[in-house]
Amino acid sequence: DVVQGRSLPRDRCRPLVVGDVSAMEYAAKAAKVVSGVDMKVRAIKAVSEAKYEYGVIDVYDMGIVKAADIPNDPEHPKPFGLGATALGGEAAFQYVKKVIELAMSGEVDATITNALSKEAINMADHHYSGHTEIYADYTKTSKYTMMLAHEELRVVHVSTHVSLREACDRVKKDRVLDVIRIANAGCKAIGIKEPKIAVGGLNPHCGENGMFGREEIEE
């Protein structure tokens, strides 16, 4: 999506990519073969070097993944052929860390992340369960959650990337109240003056007075 321009809304912002030029050049060649989209890649070492030209992707080059690390032939692309690797995990983690640093320093106004392989970043010895936890750690945020947004609907999680069994164990009154407060503040921050917040029950019919579970009663 990035190399085909679908993830670069130039009518609303001036986008640049934090990543590796070698990987983006490979992806651009593969995209041209697959879909005919011809995108150029420009390496930059500072945000101030970005030119934001149509048809060109400014890539803040991290220099982690080299051309020799990409064995696939762009004429016969196999974008998912490598699977999860420690190198891929290290690269992905460093990209996310860098965009956080750029945002915290005021060099960029907002960040957007692509899908992240949790398996890969853990293979690289970065023990996080997802973007949310990385952002929280590097921004020193103690109370946080994930919000999914689509038009008029916002969905906010009491738990994030954990097993279903652990998710049930995390449904505690204090945590639910924290998430409600975070959701309220988050909605207001994006322009919803009076958020209407519905809280889902853990059990069917919110436990039906204990018939299907007592969490709603005891918590």
Which positions does each model-derived feature cover?
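Proline-centered loop/turn at the N-terminus of a beta-strand
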Residues: 14, 143-145, 154, 196
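Contiguous, glycine/small-aliphatic-enriched amphipathic segments in soluble metabolic enzymes
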Residues: 1-131, 174-219
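FAD-binding core/adjacent interface of flavoenzyme oxidoreductases
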Residues: 136-149
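Ligand-binding beta-strand-loop-alpha-helix segment within the catalytic cores
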Residues: 148-178
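Short secondary-structure boundary micro-motifs
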Residues: 84, 131-132, 140, 153
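Conserved beta-strand scaffold positions in the cores of enzyme catalytic domains, especially
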Residues: 56-59, 146, 155
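A broad detector of the eukaryotic-type serine/threonine protein kinase catalytic domain
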Residues: 7, 140, 160-163, 169, ...
